[in-house]
Amino acid sequence: MKQFSILIAGGGSTFTPGIILMLLDNLDKFPIRQIKMFDNDAERQAKIGEACAILLKEKAPQIKFSYSTNPEEAFTDIDFVMAHIRVGKYPMRELDEKIPLRHGVVGQETCGPGGIAYGMRSIGGVIGLIDYMEKYSPNAWMLNYSNPAAIVAEATRRLRPNSKVLNICDMPIGIEVRMAEILGLESRKDMDIMYYGLNHFGWWKSVRDKQGNDLMPKLREHVSQYGYVVPKGDNQHTEASWNDTFAKAKDVLALDPTTLPNTYLKYYLFPDYVVEHSNKEYTRANEVMDGREKFVFGECEKVVKNQSSEGCALHIDEHASYIVDLARAIAFNTKEKMLLIVENNGAIVNFDSTAMVEIPCIVGSNGPEPLVVGRIPQFQKGMMEQQVTVEKLTVEAWIEGSYQKLWQAITMSKTVPSAKVAKDILDDLIEANKEYWPVLK
């Protein structure tokens, strides 16, 4: 079996050790000869990289390992780029969340004005990675799971339409893991699903078992009472903010009980509730900086200090196994059915053909073949048209350096009550993002 060379772009991410451990756990299915890391923050990456070097030496000494801030070094001789970058890191995420909240609007990483701000920072970073990949390893594929995936995917469609980039998100996978637990199934792969929408903005229209039996009634019954909170599940290890999001799905479901919703729809359908239950001084970004950031860097420090991973609490990122499934589908033409963010092109019959939609695809060595979804109901279509307009205007604003279009994008967001509030938020975001955004005129 061929052995592959992997580059993790965003090597300094706190998700990197979990992803590397997950890759090592799947070597029988996806053999690896080399793992590289790339980041533009040398100091941050070195802390993670030194610990990962020890993990690899212990668990898979045959795999060549390196990390670099030099694009040529990092991107040469690569088969797959796994991209998870956060331009501006968590201090900028904190502003994405707190600036809208100051104006009484949802402050969230990928939804509403915060997601638009993050998108404006991310476009240049992701396009840069694609260009490095195409220059130094022109046959490589990029598996991009950088947020905000919807805006990033639209930017890749507009700016690098022929690139070998697959945009994927783990949120539906996380919810499907919960669905499988609710149903008492071994794995989410025991379900056959049909899902449609935009990224962080979609609905399951059917869930069946492998024998074709309809599982929707049982799921709907559970979600209508408990949301996606799992009975006897590992809920105590889920942060409070996530538990609330999973529970709130029951109210989102009530709007259309024929489908099952993505949890992120709460930000668009219940923005008043979200703002009311937000702490304007301590947001999700603070939770992450005080939690996962300190934990992962602390554990990496211990590994380096002891020159051993013994007693180390870093664990495999199980959810991230979808990245291996995707890489295997390309490498070995497995024809696996996966949710990807792809150009609609008629898959959703009554929706913009150029929209980047999140739908099931059959993935093989030539990339994804989207499955036909058919027609979608007016309610979902209307919501998606409003949201895809936000995403398209944001990308146009970045390309054209247009203040007008970004103001329109924020105004169009279902989370924002008026054009005046949109303008006030935009002006504050411009001030905060001077280092990262193009100049808007």
Curated annotation (Swiss-Prot):
SUPFAM superfamilies: LDH C-terminal domain-like, NAD(P)-binding Rossmann-fold domains. It catalyses: alpha-maltose 6'-phosphate + H2O = D-glucose 6-phosphate + D-glucose. Induction: By the five sucrose isomers and other alpha-glucosides (but not by sucrose or glucose). Mn(2+) binds at C169, H200. It is an enzyme of class 3 (hydrolase). Optimum temperature is 40 degrees Celsius. One of its GO terms (biological process) is maltose catabolic process. Pathway: Glycan degradation; maltose degradation. Optimum pH is 7.0-7.5. Divalent metal ion. Manganese, iron, cobalt and nickel ions enhance activity whereas magnesium, zinc, calcium and strontium do not. NAD(+) binds at residues 4-70. CDD domains: GH4_GlvA_pagL_like. Its EC number is 3.2.1.122. One of its GO terms (molecular function) is maltose-6'-phosphate glucosidase activity. Keywords: Carbohydrate metabolism, Cobalt, Glycosidase, Hydrolase, Iron, Manganese, Metal-binding, NAD, Nickel. Belongs to the glycosyl hydrolase 4 family. This is Maltose-6'-phosphate glucosidase. It comes from Fusobacterium mortiferum.
